[in-house]
A protein has these predicted regions:
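Short amphipathic alpha-helix that is part of the acyltransferase structural core
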Residues: 1-4, 8, 173-209
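Acyl-donor-binding surface of acyltransferase catalytic domains
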Residues: 3-184
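Conserved glycine-rich acetyl-CoA-binding loop
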Residues: 68, 246-261, 273, 302
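A conserved short alpha-helix in the GNAT/GCN5 acetyltransferase fold that borders
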Residues: 84, 254, 263-271
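Alpha-helix termini
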Residues: 90-98, 120-125, 223-228, 269-288
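Glycine-rich, flexible loop segments associated with nucleotide phosphate handling
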Residues: 126-132, 186-188, 228-233, 267, ...
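Conserved active-site alpha-helix within GNAT-family acetyltransferase domains
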Residues: 142-156, 274-309
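A conserved beta-strand-loop-helix scaffold within acyl/acetyltransferase catalytic domains
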Residues: 205-252
Length: 309
């Protein structure tokens, strides 16, 4: 930690199904003293029912501490090739008939796409959907991405998505993050499922209703509106891997610090869903000494980068 945080949090979140798989190059049943600490390793969690969203989370030893020379590369290449071969044998489940995202639609008067990245639109993220030989990996470390590209394992038709660089933000939440008050005229709430079409219309990354309903969320609503017309003006979720995701503030309400308020609200009140499964190592009271949050932000998404600082 925190290099492997995405994989770690995804496993902590649970919501496993018969099609979930955990692949490891390390025999986790063998005693630690029987393993060579210098041998590279790779671990992956696979859930292909998540299509077209992230289906695979991985972590590898060389991501945390990359060796100075290239002597480790042949072993790493073999581990990656072996992992991909195993993943390729995991069949994706038939698409559910409800909560589809191929045509997410939009409420009247809304633009068709609101882009988190200036260079990628929703169609790019859906290109792989009809080809189950392609799986979407999430939060891939640059060292592992280089190996995947060198081995020719990245779909060339998905280059717009696959080669889009992201910056990883790690948030140390040990100092008791607290929620901050909103400006007058706004209140916190949760994202109501009836507003999922609105949420999905504001992001180019495909989202499924069946995923959103599982996730911790926070929304900001204006006060003084009738209950029949009430809809959020800002929202955010914690993803399956606890990353800050689908963060959005409507244009008319930007510049008020609402994005950071949403982030603090989620981190202060909803991270325990993941932390409750932390190993109980720490001080004499059994307190866990690890309290990290994280977010992946496209390098051309300047507004979200400001939120992470």
């Amino acid at each position: 930690m925190p290099t492997c945080i995405a994989l770690y949090r995804r496993i902590q979140f649970g919501h496993f199904n018969p099609g979930s798989h955990l692949f490891s190059s390390v025999n986790l049943a063998s005693p630690t003293h029987e393993r060579n600490a210098n041998d590279p390793w790779i671990v992956a969690f696979v859930d292909r029912t998540c299509r077209p969203e992230t289906e695979v989370w991985i972590a590898a030893s060389w991501e945390h501490d990359t060796p100075a020379d290239d002597s480790w590369l042949p072993q790493a290449d073999n581990l990656v090739k072996s992992l991909i071969e195993r993943i390729s044998k995991v069949k994706s489940s038939p698409q559910e008939t409800s909560g589809t995202v191929v045509n997410p639609g939009k409420p009247p008067g809304l633009p068709s796409t609101f882009k988190g990245s200036a260079s990628v639109d929703r169609d790019h993220y859906l290109q792989h959907l009809q080809n189950e030989q392609i799986a979407l990996f999430g939060s891939i470390h640059s060292a592992t991405c280089k190996i995947l590209n060198r081995l020719g394992l990245v779909d060339p038709n998905s280059a717009a998505v696959s080669n889009l660089p992201y910056r990883k933000y790690i948030f140390d939440l040990e100092d008791n993050v607290t929620t901050r008050s909103l400006p007058p005229g706004f209140v916190y709430g949760k994202v109501d499922p009836k507003d999922y079409p609105l949420v999905k219309s504001r992001t180019q990354i495909p989202r499924q209703d069946r995923t959103l309903v599982k996730l911790p969320s926070v929304a900001i609503y204006p006060t003084g509106t009738s209950s029949t017309t009430l809809q959020p003006i800002a929202w955010a979720f914690l993803g399956l891997d606890a990353s800050l995701t689908t963060l959005h503030v409507e244009p008319a309400y930007r510049g008020l610090g609402l994005a950071k308020s949403l982030s603090l609200k989620l981190f202060s009140e909803d991270m325990n869903i993941y932390w409750q499964h932390n190993p109980t190592v720490g001080d004499e009271n059994g307190q866990v000494d690890e309290r990290y949050g994280h977010a992946d932000v496209a390098t051309d998404n300047i507004a979200s980068q400001r939120t992470g600082t």
